[in-house]
């Protein structure tokens, strides 16, 4: 499982943006297009290559007034999935 101190960032060539034509958020990767769900969008909006996973979890738990453990499970699962798809890279914090 991914450690909470890992820092997620978008891989080179990956763009996360709002597509006005489709009226939704999209992830553009080399030769790939992903349409993340609402939960993934909330997570990805906090991915900046600086924040640790724990910080992202804390922000979302406070924003949605939800149990931190549940948020952590969702965030880690989403980031691990996106990492396997080549969208996100997870770097150990130093």
Located regions from the model:
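Acidic, low-complexity/disordered tracts enriched in E/D and polar residues
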Residues: 1-41, 45, 91-93
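Long, charge-rich, low-complexity alpha-helical segments
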Residues: 32-94
């Amino acid at each position: 499982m991914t450690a909470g101190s890992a820092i997620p960032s978008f891989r080179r060539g990956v763009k996360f943006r709002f597509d006005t034509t489709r009226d939704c958020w999209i992830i553009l990767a080399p030769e790939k297009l992903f349409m993340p769900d609402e939960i993934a969008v909330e997570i990805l909006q906090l991915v900046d290559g600086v924040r640790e996973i724990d910080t992202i979890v804390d922000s979302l738990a406070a924003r949605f007034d939800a149990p931190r453990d549940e948020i952590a499970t969702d965030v880690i699962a989403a980031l691990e999935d996106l990492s396997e798809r080549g969208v996100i890279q997870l770097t150990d914090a130093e």
